[in-house]
Amino acid sequence: AINENYLQDERASAEDYTGNLLLVKDIVTRYLRGGVMPYDAAHDAFAVSGLEERVAYSFPFRAGERELEMKFGGIADRIDTLDDGALRVVDYKTGAPHLEFDGVESLFTGTGKQRLSNILQTLLYSMILHHTRGCDAEPALYYVRSMNRPDYSPQLDDKQLGVRGARYTLYRERFEELLRAQLAEMYDPAVPFRQCEDADTCKFCDFRIICKRG
C-alpha cells in the first residue's frame, strides 16, 4: 500500500522507507492491530466489499425555474456488505470521536462548529450508495485511536431522535429536502454571498482564499 499510494513505486523495498514515512507506517500498523482488526473480529456480521472506492451520484434539485443537478462524489474508505444485504460505508478518522448530532437539521442550520462535517460526509456517501446501488446504507465512523475501548461504537448517535446506528432511509426524505433547499439557495442570484460568522471555522477550509478569508 505504501509503495502504490505514497512512493508510487511498486518495486520499492523497506530500505526505501525513511524518517517520517517509517513513523507513519508504525502508527498506522498500531492502529490496525490494536483497534480496527480486533474490533472487526468481534463484530463480524459483515463482509468487506470495497476499499478506497470512488462513488458518485448526480443529485437533482430545482433553483427557481431551472432543473439542475449537483454531482456528489468522493472516495469511500471502505464499503461493507452486512448480513441482511444492506451496505455500511466506513470512514476512518484519527481525531477524537464525534458521533453525536442533534438531527439532520443541525447539519445544515447550525453554526460552523455545530455542522459536523464528518457526519455530513458519511450521510452523503450513504445517499450516493442508496441511489446508485438500490439498497439501504449505514454510515459508520471508525475513530481508530478509540477503537480499543470496550464501549466503542462507530455508529452515529442521533440525540434528537434518540437513535443510534440509524440507516439512511430513516433520514432520506428530510435529508434530501434540506440538501435541495441548501443547493437552491446557493444557486439563487438574489441571495448574496455571506462569509461564515465564525472565523475559526475557516482556518482549515479549502475555499478560504476565494471568500477572502485566506
Regions found by a protein language model. Name each.
Residues 6, 114-119, 124-214:
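Metal-dependent nuclease catalytic regions and adjoining charged, substrate-binding loops involved
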Residues 1-2, 20, 24-28, 68-72, ...:
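Secondary-structure capping and boundary motifs in well-ordered enzyme cores
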Residues 50-132:
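Non-catalytic protein-protein interaction segments used by genome-maintenance enzymes to assemble
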Residues 4-15, 94-107, 145-163:
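Short acidic (Asp/Glu) and glycine-rich catalytic loops that position anionic groups and cofactors
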Residues 1-60:
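A non-catalytic, helix-rich entry segment at domain boundaries
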Residues 44-47, 85, 135-137:
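Residue-level signal for beta-strand positions within conserved beta-sheet cores that form or flank
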